[in-house]
Amino acid sequence: MMKVLVVVALLLTLIIYSSSDGIDDLEADELVSLMAHEQTRAKACTPRYYDCSHDRHRCCRSSMFKDVCTCFYPEGGHYKEVCTCQQPKHLEYMEKAADKIKNLFG
């Protein structure tokens, strides 16, 4: 009896899954519009060493990793916090090593 219930549930799930409207393939123009939207979104990032205090999650990506908004207090009596997009050192070293390996092996 349990096997019959499992098979019926499986068939019911497959029928519902195959008849759903949300699984339709994207048409070419929809895909192009999605890509255009993604490129527009990608251009709105904050470059490295620029001020990111207005939006700390909008730093640009390097070739492998995303930069991080790093905040600090500068020396010299300024007590205002300064935030810039920077790449952490360990990620910078990993990116340089990957580039050297890529250049070594073509």
From Swiss-Prot:
UniProt lists the family membership as follows: Belongs to the neurotoxin 19 (CSTX) family. 02 (D7) subfamily.
Q: What does the entry note on its domains?
A: The presence of a 'disulfide through disulfide knot' structurally defines this protein as a knottin.
User: Secretion signal: which residues?
Assistant: 1-20
* Tissue expr: Expressed by the venom gland.
Propeptide boundaries: 21-41
InterPro entries under this entry?
A: Spider_toxin_CSTX_knottin, Spider_toxin_CSTX_Knottin_CS
The coiled-coil segments of this chain are none
Pfam annotation, one family: Toxin_35
Keyword Disulfide bond applies: yes
PROSITE patterns, A to Z:
SPIDER_CSTX
Keywords linked to the UniProt accession: Disulfide bond, Knottin, Secreted, Signal, Toxin
Gene Ontology MF terms: toxin activity
Cellular component aspect of the GO annotation: extracellular region
Can you name the source organism? Lycosa singoriensis
The entry's localization annotation reads:
Secreted
**Which cysteines link up through disulfide bonds?**
C45-C60, C52-C69, C59-C85, C71-C83
Specify whether Disulfide bond is a keyword of the entry: yes
This one is known as: Toxin-like structure LSTX-D9
